[in-house]
């Protein structure tokens, strides 16, 4: 009897798959997003300025002086437990040296100049002044310039792309196109305004960026994103398939019921779902879910009470540094948690990481950046069911070894029906554009080259 059950159970599971997927094949209706929803102060609605203005990043003397004073007047930190590295979070033994560098050695004027090396702009979209960089390469007459909307996530910023931009915009004899980069700060992040009322979630940010690209004159363009950029980019590809002609992501995921079902089927029969050499990226599920549970505590806080924790992070440079840089340690490679210094020098210099901190500190935007979690994990946003609506846009994924979550192509195709390729690399983590800028850029360029072959259309200006 037990032998018969052993044979029958797998057959029953396999037989149920087509039926289950058939039931889920009928997608929910496309939600109607308000393309003109106003997120700024109501009294300014009749006075909107739609011009595009140059912008320059400035670290004022007053702000820098106050920052240094706050660092100097910090309270002593509780000593860490012995031998824990970064397993309990940022190791307080490492904090003093980081804060000393920030206050005494970080070259504020030099880094301000560095951050302004690319052209920055602001324009008002739906009541919010949206900051963005726009980098247009100089090209020969026979090379077409095509636009790429480049989207960051949390706790990153446009700073993640600085090292990749020269590779992305490079002109090559092997390509008949070159990329123009449009890299905005998400609403509530850095130099972009935050909403004044609740409701600005990933789907609504997608509308803002659609309108931004329209303001810049583009009818069609490519989108690339990781972290929140992946979710927003996916929402754009889902909602606006006429405008988005290709989507590249290094964190493309689908959280639909069908995807979850297939993941559990794969737990019983991994070879049905994932290539053997990649099985350890997804299975065993108990291990993967345990890791996610350990790492997603911040998400629960930010999805429920972002303003509370944000008060401390806005007030304390030590708190902000520890909170953000702990993510740059753990999410780059989980093995770095065992290192006493968190392995933060593994990929970056202190200046690179503090540049990113400065975009949060100087703008007091840590609270408003975290509110995106509360809005996007709300029941209202889940009720849009965007994740259950298939993307009809050509999609390309880049899958780093240490990304927080992995899904094989057979699962991704439930959402991204025109999945062109899944590039798998045995290196890199969550901040891939910042970690491995050249590898990242090469993959993006390869993807866009393939997208152009598939559709054989010119981007419309």
Curated annotation (Swiss-Prot):
InterPro entries: AB_hydrolase_fold (IPR029058), Epox_hydrolase-like (IPR000639), Epoxide_hydro_N (IPR010497), Epoxide_hydrolase (IPR016292). Expressed in fat body, foregut and midgut but not in brain, subesophageal ganglia or silk gland of larvae on day 1 of fifth instar. One of its GO terms (cellular component) is endoplasmic reticulum membrane. Keywords: Aromatic hydrocarbons catabolism, Endoplasmic reticulum, Hydrolase, Membrane, Microsome, Transmembrane, Transmembrane helix. It is found in: Microsome membrane; Endoplasmic reticulum membrane. It is a single-pass membrane protein. Its EC number is 3.3.2.9. The active site is at 227 (nucleophile), 373 (proton donor), 430 (proton acceptor). Activity increases as temperature increases from 0 to 37 degrees Celsius. One of its GO terms (biological process) is epoxide metabolic process. The chain crosses the membrane at residues 4-24. Its main location: membrane. It is an enzyme of class 3 (hydrolase). SUPFAM superfamilies: alpha/beta-Hydrolases. The keyword Membrane applies. Coiled coil: none annotated. GO terms for molecular function: cis-stilbene-oxide hydrolase activity. Catalyzes juvenile hormone hydrolysis. Degrades juvenile hormone III (JH III) about 3 times and 5 times slower than juvenile hormone I (JH I) and II (JH II), respectively. Degrades cis-stilbene oxide and trans-stilbene oxide about 18 and 43 times slower than JH III, respectively. Belongs to the peptidase S33 family. Homodimer. This is Juvenile hormone epoxide hydrolase. It comes from Bombyx mori (Silk moth).
